Swiss-Prot record:
Residues 1389-1712 form the FERM domain. Residues 265-308, 362-438 form a coiled coil. Residues 294-305, 1805-1820 have a biased composition (Basic and acidic residues). This is Uncharacterized protein CG43867.
């Protein structure tokens, strides 16, 4: 925005001054030529530049007409008037600078005063201006006045000069100018505008100075002379510059005004105001800087002219300055002012005196002048330096401001475009509403989805910006809520990170109150392919293409909002019947166009393959791949108006003879082909339940994260419904059905009888179901109670079908309130009744209109009204807003006082009340309830006001009740045995309070029950004085089992307290207690009393004061028996271990030779460790015998299975009974401890220097202490050993004692110990210490047993790190330990892992290796990414051939193998099948679109083979031609170039067809056709000769990724429907459930066309429900409510799809390393992992952190759909750009591993696992 006058002197070109960074005005960086204003002395006024030399200044009159002036918008220094100047320009301008009065006491001849800046105007001038020039017409005439210069200008100049000289002032001169004929003084006003920095719209042409500005120049000169003195009029060096300045100003203003009248001033007001403010700040800053410069320059000039001082300079230069001087802008200026002013004044006074007396200057004066000159020179240099710095800063600021203004201008332009588009949309919307309101006929049936592929038709069709995606908007959304504007980039509204809120509010306000009817169905398409409706959407050849675009953005219905897709989709109905349904085809459901062609050129052969992929993939292009034969085989579907819409399916051209998807060449649909078997029956599911009991968990969504709320499916019984008879007015008509209603003859036995309580394995976080949106339920759309729980009459159940075409308006009268409900509609896609927002609180069932009686099979979702007093639906804990209720921020506010007023004694609170959210209802939604805990029971009401009524439910807290809390969520569960209540608090603090009080009540209730039982007799009881913390109290004390209880009285059932004696220590003390004032009731107690002290583990001591010795002895004896503390506690074996601990494991201690600690051949008579029950003692003795039997018989190679079974049974016995685990470790330690003997001497000699205590210790030992020969260490004292030590001299050789068994017995004992320490460790810390000490004492690399001991040390550390095991060791594990010493290998076991390309990799592991660790090792050896590639491990099923099981990351691999072997034996033939072992495979499970560029070559190769497996099995929609192209690529990848040797093999082509061609195409071919296809495959294969494997892999994946659902894991499922909604045939067809990374999609079985889509953000609950898969979704589009969907699937598939959805949801909130950040839905750390003490996190694994492979089920073996491909579907509009990856950067040879290894591994050719453990396989 520049404008230029005639020309400008080059000496005046300077950079603009610095401006504020916050300014937003725009300036032009180039050619900033500005004129600097002059001060009284003619110096430049630029604050940031050095003073201009006198020689460089222009002389008077030098500013001719050739000077040019350029203004750059913001900085207009040249148009300003500084403090000491007054021009006509600034007199007229009235808004920019401050009002400053100059020279109040001016001695000018004019005698008047004038104002600087623009603050004060002459009233006479203003009146004259308004009277004569007020009309806009005059403005227009003056602005265009371009008269040439007139001779009258000189006359006016003379008149104005005389008027100023006579004292009239500049205002009179201005009036003279205004009144002169032909003058255009309005230029002056606009010059004032320019002085404020107002920008001009565009560059103006060059013009001569206007004649009216010549007198203005003269007036400016006269005004300046009047203010500065008469001499300055003639001699001022600034006169010429001031003329040029004034002329340039007038010229610029003339150009501006000639073009300014044509602009819209209102549109620029905003920008002008901002620029004015910025200019004001600039002017103020410059004024301050110029004030300081003026003083310095004036001083400098006076000093330079000192020898010839004029008479005028005797006056002080500062006499006329403004009284209020601004502070200089720099410290140097202030310093110069302060430093120079006094000296200057002194020298000035002396000079004046000398001049008056006529004497010459003295020497002192010369010195003063010299010093002043030096100081002035220093100040000049400082100013120069500062000017350079300021100039550099100003340049940077200028550049930043320019860039900022440029960006803002671009944003403004974009907003203007959006505004235009929104206005067009609004007009279109109004027109459409007007057209709809004019129609009074019945609207046709609403289409479930409408796809509008509209282009701009401007020749840039390939540009993705011009391609409109198939947006979707449900008619329910249009009806039920105000419309919002579409984002101009045509993205789906769920993908928007920010919406233009202001535009949205404008659009809502514009259409507020308007009701929009649903769209009419479109019966046919226009010739151009664009659907037409009522003339609103035009054809492509129409000129109004923008209208079509806007209409497509607003009125595209959604397949995403189709909760009743199974009712409205004809492809999923067995027969159409009389129901009015519409068709949903591939093209109509928004299948996008092919991706944009790449920027680089492909080779012709590669481009041809991509073209085939575009045409041959169903859904990859515009839908042309669906063959006509497919459409011809399907029945014609009639819509509601009777129009045949089946021709909409015949919109493509075929390739070859019938390239339809799933046609099978006339042999039925895809579901009947051999490649896609239907789901097995329920009996087959039972038989193929896998090698573990399958229990499908249930998940709820909280903050975008899937949290497990149940470890087993919902059974539909009252036991898993925690509603307790609450109002069930909201029900789904098809929900509460039994599996017998559809499959009467089917049974299910697997996984349905397990306990409802969750085990430690699956105790993941419990969370409430997420409600979409953050608005309060009271602000949600009002719902109507349509159906009550008790009423079952047809009038109360809305199960009739309302015709979708009948969008009728009915009035529902509310009998209670007497007003009417507005118009309602029933959307056919969801079947939900839509009502106006605030109309009624209830709706009588009998008042429903007749059309609702025709709703058949329609899901009536949550339609209940929210009354003002009822807070039925609670806010989820994550949606608590700032207006949270008080109990959320103060969790203990309503809690009863927990402590009594006593300062020392605390009483636990047993009562509490407050709000909790409870999971209840058939939809399992969270409802807010008022809970009150009192008298040992938990009651709840609907609200706090209902406390006086009967409670809705009651929870008894007895001994069976279990209270479990969740990790990471404020949710806990109360399991009463019959029901499980899921409760959610508002915060973690509130939850902790509730759990603490509930546990206190439960503990108290359990004590009551314990005392009331007849079989629980107290061991001892009586009155005892208890002293605690110095406070005595007489209590009734009872010793019950190991619990010491004390009560107020014998009849009390609530104890005052309790002490667990298990870890307490009991001692007798001599009447010493910490009591300060013991109670004495009578004189008899004055005698000495006896005291027993109890020292609990983590508490202070408690003293019991007893009156007599017999009573004291009785209590002391019984308390000591039940206590667990002290050296004498426990068995004799444990006491010896305790004594060894006291000696710190001294190897010379005599206790090591105690026979109880050493091996024995006899059977023990009592357990070695403490048993809590007597029933476990016989089990311990049996365990000892089995171990003794294992060790006594030598291992024989032919009969090795004898030892395998013995070891497995003993270890399983210990796993089943945890108390036996410590016992087994003790037995193995004892049986592997040798008796040591010497050659010499018999008997025992004790050193004479032994002390008394040592002799007593030896004498107190058992008589059999020394049963083996020993010898005294006579040199013990001389060798520096302890005098109490008894040791054998090291020089004497040690031989085996006679009590030792054969050597093999010890070896086998160590082998069994090596197996045991990998399964469990002792629970007692004392015995764990002893085990570690035993291993370290026996570890020796030179002996066989020493090597086993060294391995046991490593295995023990691994078990302590990763936790224990679940099942017995497998046969493979036992054989690996028995047949070779594990010491030689850090990982003693190994197993092959099979890849999809028929290769395998042998990986080593140990007994504690988890699947996660094993997979990390495998990925390292294969060269793939670790944990981020989505690949997981799967195992085959021992029974079913095609069933595979997903292995959880935290499961132990040895447990997996053991369970597999157990299932093979138990569910198979029952015999040992030693020839079969488990087969592990490595496949992709989770596919991420954003990690494509991070894939390694090995991953892409494996993904190619996995995708090919899906294609061959018919799980990929492609044409015959594309199938041949992909088969040829796979042949090149798998077998290399087609050479002459291969051509001799006739079956090589047939082999390629068998491996890479779809079954459904190959099986229907005859012999001749098969030969032709084989030749065609060979010919395409030959064309790929010389192509590298990397190129073929890249092309193959690029072609396959063009399918929008590439990567979606496919599951076949049968939708469940209510009996009323079943079709005439009573059957519902099977569909595909495609699980992608962002949504669950429903596809047709035959065509794989999309039917419905449920994003994870709308999923509330999912998992098992009886024998079906349940999915509960919410509708946040204004339809309100939730919907429950059921799908019949096999149990393994239900488990797999549940875990897969949970893993995808939990991974959305994480960032994959090395990949871009996804939309974060959850907080950091969201992962479906185990958080139990038995399963600590592994330090080396990263899968737990990234969330790709997670654990969420009860069992360690989860099933997987063995035919599923795991890829991605991330865009809502199903567009997928083609990705091409260069093969560079990878290591050569990584893809060729499949060619150098064995390709075909049959089951009977499995590698020998026991021999495949080379030493080079290790952990790196």
């Amino acid at each position: 925005m520049q404008w230029t006058a005639a020309s400008c002197d080059q000496h005046d070109q300077h950079d603009p001054p610095a401006v504020n960074r916050n300014s937003i005005e725009q300036r032009t960086p180039a050619n900033n030529c500005e004129v600097d204003p002059m001060d009284a002395t003619g110096s430049t006024k630029h604050p940031h530049l050095p003073k201009q030399r006198e020689a460089d200044r222009p002389v008077s009159g030098s500013g001719g007409g050739s000077s040019s002036l350029t203004l750059s918008g913001a900085v207009t220094t040249s148009m300003e008037v500084t403090v000491s100047t007054t021009t006509t320009t600034t007199i007229i301008e009235s808004s920019s600078s401050t009002n400053t009065t100059l020279e109040k006491n001016s001695p000018s001849p004019a005698g008047g005063s004038c104002s600087s800046g623009s603050g004060s105007l002459s009233p006479a001038y203003l009146q004259h201006h308004l009277q004569h020039h007020g009309s806009p017409l005059h403005h227009l005439q003056v602005h265009h006045h371009t008269a040439p210069p007139s001779p009258l200008a000189a006359v006016r100049s003379a008149q104005m000069g005389s008027s100023v000289a006579n004292g009239a002032g500049p205002a009179a001169a201005c009036l003279a100018v205004c009144c002169s004929p032909g003058s255009s003084h309005h230029h002056l006003g606009h010059v004032g505008h320019l002085a404020t920095g107002h920008p001009l719209p565009h560059q103006l042409p060059h013009q001569l100075p206007h004649p009216s500005l010549y007198p203005l120049m003269a007036a400016a000169q006269l005004g300046y002379a009047g203010s500065s003195g008469p001499s300055s009029l003639v001699n001022s060096p600034a006169l010429g510059r001031r003329k040029r300045y004034t002329s340039n100003s007038s010229n610029c203003s003339s150009q501006f005004n000639n073009n300014y009248a044509g602009l819209d001033v209102d549109s620029l007001d905003d920008m002008l105001r901002k620029l004015t403010e910025l200019e004001q700040r600039v002017i103020e800053a410059e004024e301050r800087a110029e004030e300081a410069e003026d003083k310095v320059r004036a001083m400098e000039q006076r000093l330079s002219e000192w020898p010839k001082p004029p008479p005028q300079q005797a006056q002080h230069p500062h006499s006329h300055s403004h009284p209020h001087q601004p502070i200089p802008s720099h410290p140097q200026e202030q310093q110069a002012k302060n430093h120079c002013s006094p000296s200057h004044q002194a020298s000035g006074g002396a000079t004046a005196g000398a001049a008056g007396s006529g004497l010459p200057p003295t020497q002192e004066t010369e010195k003063t002048i010299t010093s002043l000159e030096i100081q002035v020179e220093e100040q000049r240099q400082l100013r120069l330096h500062d000017a350079r710095q300021i100039e550099a800063k100003a340049a940077k600021i200028k550049e930043w401001v320019n860039n900022k203004l440029r960006d803002l201008e671009e944003q403004n332009q974009l907003l203007r475009e959006q505004n235009v588009k929104c206005n067009q949309q609004l007009e279109l919307l109004k027109n459409h509403i007007a057209n709809q309101s004019q129609r009074h006929s019945i609207v046709g049936p609403v289409r479930n989805s409408l796809s509008l592929d509209v282009q701009d038709f401007t020749g840039s069709g390939s540009n993705p910006e011009h391609r409109r995606r198939s947006e979707s908007l449900d008619p329910q959304e249009i009806i039920g809520r105000p419309l919002t504007s579409s984002y101009p980039h045509h993205q789906h509204r769920r993908n928007l990170s920010m919406e233009p809120q202001e535009l949205e509010r404008n659009l809502v306000a514009a259409v507020d109150g308007l009701t929009l009817a649903p769209l009419s169905s479109i019966s046919n398409k226009a010739p151009g392919g664009v659907p037409t409706e009522s003339g609103v959407v035009t054809r492509p050849d129409s000129s109004d293409t923008d209208t079509a675009h806007d209409y497509a953005e607003i009125y595209t219905p959604s397949c995403e909002k189709l909760p009743a897709w199974m009712k409205n989709n004809p492809a999923l109905m067995a027969s159409g019947g009389n129901s009015s349904t519409t068709t949903t085809t591939t093209s109509e459901l928004g299948v996008p166009r092919p991706p944009t062609p790449p920027l680089h050129r492909f080779p012709s052969w590669e481009a041809k393959i991509y073209q085939v992929a575009n045409d041959g993939l169903a859904g990859a292009g515009t839908g042309t791949s669906t063959a006509e034969s497919t459409a011809s085989q399907e029945p014609d579907i009639q819509d509601g108006m009777g129009t045949n819409l089946s021709n909409g399916r015949r919109h493509g051209h075929g390739h070859g003879s019938g390239t339809g998807i799933g046609t099978g060449d006339g042999h039925g649909t895809l579901g009947s082909t051999p490649g896609t078997p239907l789901p097995p029956s329920r009996q087959q599911q039972t038989a193929s339940g896998g090698f573990c009991d399958i229990s499908v968990p249930v998940y709820a969504t909280v903050k975008g994260r899937a949290s497990q709320i149940r470890s087993m499916p919902f059974t539909g019984d009252s036991s898993d419904d925690s509603s307790d008879g609450e109002d069930h007015a909201v029900m789904l008509t098809h929900h509460s059905h039994n599996s017998s209603s559809t499959d009467n003859t089917e049974t299910s036995t697997s996984g349905s009888a397990s306990s409802p309580s969750k085990s430690l394995k699956t105790s993941s976080s419990l969370s409430p179901a997420k409600r979409s949106g953050s608005e309060s339920p009271k602000n949600a759309k009002a719902r109507v109670h349509i159906q009550s729980r008790t009423s079952t009459t047809p009038s109360s159940r809305i199960n009739q079908h309302l015709q979708p075409s009948q969008h009728q308006h009915h009035t529902l009268s509310n009998q209670n309130h007497g007003h009417q409900l507005g118009a309602y509609t029933v959307t056919p896609s969801s079947g939900q009744l839509s009502l106006p927002r605030y109309h009624a609180n209830a709706l009588q069932p009998g008042s429903l209109p007749s059309p609702l009686q025709h709703m058949r099979g329609t899901v009536i979702s949550d339609l209940s009204f929210e009354s003002g007093l009822s807070d039925d639906y609670a806010l989820p804990p994550d949606a608590v807003s700032e207006s949270t209720c008080m109990d959320a921020s103060m969790p203990s506010l309503l809690m009863r006082q927990s402590y009594v007023d006593s300062p020392s004694k605390k009483i636990e609170s047993l009562e509490k009340m407050g709000h909790l959210a409870k999971l209840g209802g058939k939809l399992k939604t969270w409802r807010k309830r008022w809970f009150v805990l009192k008298n040992g029971s938990l009651n709840y009401w609907k609200s706090q006001h209902d406390v006086q009524r009967k409670p809705q439910g009651q929870i008894q807290l007895d001994e069976v009740c279990r209270i479990n809390r969740a990790e990471g969520a404020s949710t806990f569960e109360i399991d009463t045995g019959k029901k499980v209540y899921y409760l959610t608090a508002d915060s973690h603090a509130t939850m902790d309070d509730w759990i603490r009080v509930l546990q206190n009540v439960q503990r108290r209730n359990a004590t009551k029950l314990l005392l009331s039982r007849d079989d629980q007799k107290p061991t001892v009881q009586g009155w005892v004085t208890k002293v605690k913390n110095g406070h005595p109290k007489k209590c009734w004390c009872v010793l019950l089992g190991k619990m010491f209880l004390y009560f107020k009285a014998p009849a009390e059932t609530n104890p005052l307290g309790q002490i667990n004696m298990r870890d307490a220590r009991v001692e007798e003390v001599e009447h010493v207690s910490d009591s300060d004032s013991e109670e004495r009731e009578d004189a008899a107690q004055d005698q000495a009393r006896l005291t027993v002290a109890i020292y609990p583990a983590h508490q202070g001591p408690t003293y019991l004061i007893l009156s007599g010795k017999p009573e004291r002895d009785n209590w002391l004896y019984h308390l000591t028996v039940v206590s667990g503390g002290g050296p004498s506690a426990g068995t004799q074996y444990e006491q010896l271990v305790q004594k060894l601990m006291e000696t710190d494991g001294d190897p010379n201690c005599v206790l090591w030779r105690h026979p109880i600690l050493l091996h024995t051949k006899d059977t023990i008579t009592a357990p070695l460790s403490s048993m809590h029950t007597e029933t476990m003692q016989p089990e311990a003795i049996k365990l000892f015998k089995s171990i003794q039997l294992f060790m006594s018989v030598a291992v024989n190679q032919p009969g090795i299975d004898y030892h395998v079974v013995l070891a497995q049974n003993a270890l399983q016995h210990a796993l089943d009974m945890p108390e036996l685990q410590t016992e087994m470790i003790c037995i193995l330690i004892k049986q592997t401890s040798r008796h040591l003997g010497q050659k010499l001497s018999v008997g025992v000699q004790v050193n004479k220097k032994l002390g008394k205590q040592t002799r007593q210790l030896l004498l107190c030992a058992t008589q059999s202490l020394f049963t083996c020969d020993t010898q005294q260490a006579g040199h013990a004292q001389a060798n520096g050993s302890s005098p109490t030590s008894i040791q054998a001299p090291s020089a004497t050789p040690i031989i085996d004692c006679k009590s030792n068994p054969p050597v093999y017995s010890f070896v086998q004992g160590w082998q069994l110990l090596a197996l045991a320490v990998s399964l469990f460790v002792p629970r007692s810390s004392r015995l764990l210490w002893y085990l570690k000490l035993h291993l370290s004492r026996n570890a020796d690399t030179k002996t066989e047993t020493g090597k086993y001991a060294a391995y046991c040390e490593r295995a023990l550390e691994r078990t302590l790190k990763n936790g224990g095991r679940e099942t017995k060791p497998s046969r493979m594990e036992v054989l690996s330990i028995l047949l070779k010493n594990p010491y030689h290998h850090s990982l003693p076991h190994a197993i092959p892992v099979h890849m999809m390309n028929s290769t395998y990799q042998v990986v080593s592991f140990d007994g504690s290796t988890t699947i996660e660790e094993f997979q990390a090792t495998l990925a390292h050896e294969l060269g793939t990414r670790d944990a981020t590639n989505g690949f997981c491990l799967f195992s085959d099923d021992p029974i079913e051939k095609d069933l595979e099981h997903y292995l959880e990351p935290l499961a132990k691999l040895c447990d997996v193998i053991s369970k597999w072997e157990t299932a093979l034996r138990e569910k198979g033939s029952g015999k040992f099948e030693n020839s079969r072992v488990i087969q592990l495979s490595y496949k992709n499970r989770l596919y991420w679109k954003h990690t494509i560029k991070c894939e390694t070559d090995k991953e892409r190769l494996l993904l190619c083979y996995q995708t090919n497996s899906q294609i061959v099995q018919g799980r990929f929609p492609l044409s015959r031609e594309l199938a041949l192209e992909l088969a040829s690529l796979m042949s090149q990848i798998d077998m290399g170039d087609y050479s002459l040797e291969k051509s001799r093999d006739v079956g090589v082509g047939l082999k390629g067809l068998d491996k890479f061609y779809p079954y459904r195409y190959r099986d229907a071919l005859g012999a001749e056709q098969l030969k032709d296809v084989q030749e065609l495959l060979v010919s395409k294969w030959m064309l790929l000769k010389g192509r590298s494997t990397l190129d073929c892999v890249r092309i193959y994946l690029t072609c396959c990724r063009k399918w929008p659902y590439f990567g979606a894991c496919l599951f076949q499922a049968k939708p469940r429907q209510s009996p009323e909604s079943n079709t005439a045939s009573g059957a519902t067809p099977v569909a595909w459930l495609a699980v992608a990374e962002d949504a669950l999609n429903v596809l047709e079985l035959s065509t794989m066309a999309p039917v419905a889509r449920y994003p994870y953000s709308s999923v509330m609950t999912f998992g098992g429900c009886q024998d079906d898969f349940m999915l509960v979704v919410s509708h946040d589009d204004g339809g309100g409510g939730e919907q429950k969907l059921l799908f019949a699937m096999s149990k393994p598939k239900i488990l797999e799809i549940t875990l897969l959805i949970a893993d995808y949801m939990n991974a959305l909130g994480h960032t994959v390393p090395g990949t871009p950040q996804m939309n974060s839905l959850t907080r950091n750390g969201s992962h479906r992992s185990l958080r139990t003490s038995q399963r600590p996190n592994l330090g080396g694994g990263s899968a737990v952190a990234t969330g790709f492979s997670t654990n969420a089920t009860t069992t360690a073996h989860n099933t997987l759909n063995s035919h599923a491909t795991h890829t991605l579907n991330s865009n809502h509009s199903h567009t997928l750009s083609s990705s091409h990856h260069a093969g560079g950067g990878s290591q050569p040879g990584t893809l060729s591993s499949g060619h150098h290894q064995h390709h075909h591994i049959q089951q009977h050719h499995q590698p020998d696992i026991l021999k495949s453990t080379p030493d080079h396989q290790r952990i790196k």
